[in-house]
From Swiss-Prot:
It comes from Arabidopsis thaliana (Mouse-ear cress). The keyword Nucleotide-binding does not apply. It is found in: Cytoplasm, Cytoskeleton, Spindle; Cytoplasm, Cytoskeleton, Phragmoplast. GO terms for molecular function: microtubule minus-end binding. Involved in microtubules reorganization during spindle and phragmoplast development. Belongs to the HAUS5 family. Disulfide bonds: none annotated. This is AUGMIN subunit 5. Keywords: Cell cycle, Cell division, Coiled coil, Cytoplasm, Cytoskeleton, Microtubule, Mitosis. Residues 115-191, 462-501 form a coiled coil.
Length: 796
């Protein structure tokens, strides 16, 4: 014990450490109680022995207050490593020898530090300068932050204003589009209501006619009611032309009557076409009276059952049949009048003039494709689109231009032929006149002057002929230049149309590439998501094997160890003789009597009790379970005294403050507390497992949602692909075919132009004849006469 007390810290040092470092003070609200006094030195000596000695050494040497720690750090910062001795002197203020040594070291340090005073001052000045610089930089950074925040606010305000303006514009455009759509819907609804009103008026008239009919019977009334029930479903037929915007509302009866009338009209047109060739301009019938008899319709099994049913149902109500036929006739008349308004009489006259002046029949121009009379007015019952490339407005214009050019060429050829004929007659007369003058030249003696005059006249005639030829060639060139300019303009239009189509093709290709990119991206994302969610169960199993399962195993091990520890405690309790360790008194005096020797009093009893306490502490340090209940009882006796003096109460408060450094030695309460902590840990880990399950469920739901989204994207992509393959690709092929056709037409026109350019001028109008001879013949005749006249003039 003496060796232990010599190495152990003194109670005075412990008390000074409590007051200075730990800030131990008297309890204010308990001034009158037993806990208001400072613990005595004897009480501190009782707890500073055994296993508590190294703990008190560690606490006194290592545990310092916040003020001391701050002072030590400041000294280290200012003085550096030279002040270690002063720090050492401030660490152990409880010992007298350390105080004297600290004073001597302070004197030596003061002597040595005089040489470093200037260095310290320089360091302090540098530190102050650095602090000022840091403060200045902080102010600069703070000011720049304020400027940056102000600029960010300004930018955000401008962005908000711009976004607001864009939103307002978008809202205005949206409202405008909605109003336009609503206006259009209102117009359509107005037209539909007007048609409904018209149809209702027709029904009212039909009902009035049915009531006023004299020959009405119950059968007719029943048939009318049945038909009216069947006619409750309307069929809407829109006009083929978008400009007319015709909406036709008709019942089932009227539709059937219209179909029958159309069929009868088509049969009548076919019969007239076959009977009268002049109907199509193919010939003239010599005996029209015989052909008239062919117009009679003799149906021998040609009427279909559907037509018979419609006719029988219509004949049950003759007034209604007549009204329907009249309405159909009025509609056909209106359509015919509209078609007649579209006809250009002047163009037709030019076409007929060109047709019959050139003694050949050309194809008629195609009718309007969108016309509802295309079947009746197209030749041989063909649809208007079948003859679209045979005759069109462009071809009609080409024929008109060709007719004008042919007419100009004909007039020019006729003028040239007439001039050549007049020149021939003049040359013949001149030749006859020159021969007469040649016979009499020897008489008159004036041959030289006459030959000069004739030479001048020939020169003048030659110049006039050349001028006329140049004039004609100039006119021809002007007409050809105009035609070529028109061809260039048409070719430019064709090139522009081809460029537009090519631009559409490029746009289509760009959209197709974008769709392909989107499709591949979605497919890749889908595959990645499928792979990720397929790996989730494995990852969850691995995570559980790494976290939850080991934690559960640890809990099981802790429970087993706690169970073993409880069994050891119980066995120790039963092994103790008469359970005397658990029957310790609850007062310090009784504790001293029970731990001391029987019959001993005074210091001997205290020494014997201290010896027994040291042995008990050693047993507890050796992990002997039988010593733990005694220590717990002693702690309870010290912490909850009954009528003790002030020193023992202060000792109990000190022990309460030192609970953080007393290691629990495994009492029943500690075991139960550990078991409760283990159970709480199990519950926490069960909650973690449930959270993991909920996360897995959420992940499964998210996977299903993502699969639905992916399926929707795939369906949308397939729909877009079908749209591309069904609509865009045929349109693209049609555009390419049209471009190829336009290119072929341009090549054909270029070939015609080259062919015309290679031909001589005399072959342009070789079919024109004057007095039975062509222009080339007359020109050759003129050349022969000129040569003969030159020969005769040379002879003379």
């Amino acid at each position: 014990m003496q060796s232990l007390s010599s190495s152990a810290p003194t109670p005075e040092a412990i008390l000074e450490w409590l007051q200075k470092e730990m800030g131990y003070r008297q309890l204010g609200p308990y001034n009158g109680s037993s806990k208001s006094h400072v613990p005595s030195i004897d009480a501190i000596r009782k707890i500073c022995r055994g296993n508590m000695i190294p703990i008190w050494n560690f606490l006194i040497n290592r545990v310092k207050s916040e003020k001391t720690v701050e002072r030590i750090r400041r000294n280290i910062t200012v003085h550096g490593g030279s002040s270690n001795a002063s720090i050492g002197s401030s660490v152990n203020p409880g010992k007298e020898e350390s105080k004297s040594k600290g004073r001597r070291k302070d004197k030596t340090v003061t002597g040595e530090s005089s040489s470093y005073a200037e260095d310290r001052e320089a360091a302090l000045q540098e530190r102050e300068l650095a602090a000022k610089e840091v403060e200045r930089l902080r102010n600069i950074v703070r000011r720049q932050r304020k400027d940056l925040k102000a600029r960010m606010l300004e930018v955000s305000r401008e962005e908000a204003e711009r976004k607001r303006m864009l939103d307002e514009r978008a809202n205005y455009r949206h409202k405008q589009a909605l109003l336009e759509a609503y206006d259009q819907q209102c117009d359509e609804a107005t037209r539909i209501f007007a048609e409904y009103h018209k149809r209702l008026q027709v029904y009212v008239n039909q009902a009035n006619d049915a009531q006023r009919s004299v020959n009405s019977s119950n059968e007719v009334l029943s048939s009318l009611s049945a038909n009216s029930e069947r006619e409750a479903v309307y069929s809407t037929v829109k006009g083929t032309k978008s400009a007319d915007d015709v909406i036709l509302m008709e019942t089932t009866r009227e539709r059937n009557i219209r179909i029958v009338c159309d069929l009868l009209a088509s049969r009548m047109i076919e019969r007239i076409r076959n009977s009268f060739p002049a109907y199509e301009g193919n010939g003239i019938c010599s005996l029209p009276e015989l052909e008239t008899a062919k117009l009679g319709f003799e149906y021998d099994g040609e009427i279909t059952d559907e037509m018979k049913t419609v006719i029988v149902n219509s004949l049950r109500g003759p007034p209604l049949l007549l009204q329907a036929i009249a309405a159909y006739t009025l509609r056909i008349k209106t359509l015919i009048s509209r078609e007649m308004e579209k006809i250009d009489v002047r163009a037709d006259a030019e076409m007929l003039r060109y047709k019959f002046e050139n003694n050949r029949v050309t194809d008629n121009s195609s009718s309007d494709v969108s016309s509802p009379l295309s079947y009746q007015f197209n030749g041989n019952g063909k649809i208007g689109t079948d003859t679209h490339f045979q005759g069109s407005n462009n071809q009609l214009l080409e024929r008109q231009k060709a007719h004008v050019q042919q007419f100009l060429a004909t007039e020019d050829a006729l003028n040239k032929a007439a001039e050549a004929r007049d020149l021939c007659h003049k040359f013949i007369n001149r030749l006859h006149g020159s021969a007469d003058t040649a016979t009499h030249s020897f008489v008159g003696g004036t041959t030289q002057s006459g030959s000069n005059l004739r030479q001048f006249e020939l020169d003048v005639w030659g110049k006039e002929r050349e001028a006329a030829g140049l004039r004609a060639s100039l006119n021809t060139l002007l007409s050809e230049i105009q035609r070529l300019n028109k061809l260039c303009a048409e070719r430019k239009e064709a090139e522009d149309s081809l460029k537009k189509k090519w631009k559409k093709i490029e746009e289509f290709d760009a959209r197709r590439s974008e769709l392909e990119t989107i499709y591949t991206t979605l497919l890749k994302a889908n595959m990645d998501a499928v792979a990720f969610w397929n790996q989730q169960p494995l990852a969850a199993r691995e995570y559980a094997s790494a976290t939850v399962i080991p934690a559960s195993e640890v809990v099981v091990d802790i429970s087993n160890s706690a169970k073993d520890f409880i069994e050891k405690e119980v066995s120790a309790f039963f092994q103790s003789p008469d359970n005397s360790l658990y029957m310790l008194p609850a007062t310090p005096q009784g504790l001293l009597e029970s731990m001391g020797a029987n019959g001993s009093t005074g210091p001997e009893a205290v020494a014997y009790a201290e010896k027994n306490a040291a042995l008990l502490t050693a047993r507890a340090g050796a992990r002997d379970p039988s010593a733990i209940p005694s220590i717990c009882r002693i702690s309870a006796a010290l912490q909850y005294p009954a009528g003790l003096e002030g020193s023992d109460a202060s000792l109990a408060s000190v022990l309460e403050s030192l609970e953080f450094c007393l290691r629990v030695r495994g009492s029943e309460a500690c075991v139960l507390e550990d078991l409760a902590k283990a159970i709480d840990l199990v519950h926490i880990r069960q909650d973690l497992v449930e959270s993991g399950h909920s996360l897995l469920d959420h992940a499964f739901r998210a996977q299903q949602k993502y699969e639905r989204t992916t399926n929707y994207c795939l369906d949308l992509a397939s729909e877009q692909e079908n749209t591309i393959s069904d609509q865009w690709l045929p349109e693209l092929r049609t555009a390419v075919q049209n471009a190829q056709a336009s290119s072929e037409h341009c090549k054909y026109v270029r070939g015609l132009l080259d062919e015309w350019w290679e031909q001589p001028a005399s072959t342009v109008v070789d079919w024109v004849t004057v007095d039975g001879q062509s222009v080339a013949a007359w020109q050759n005749h003129v050349k022969q006469l000129l040569a003969f006249y030159d020969k005769e003039s040379l002879r003379t």
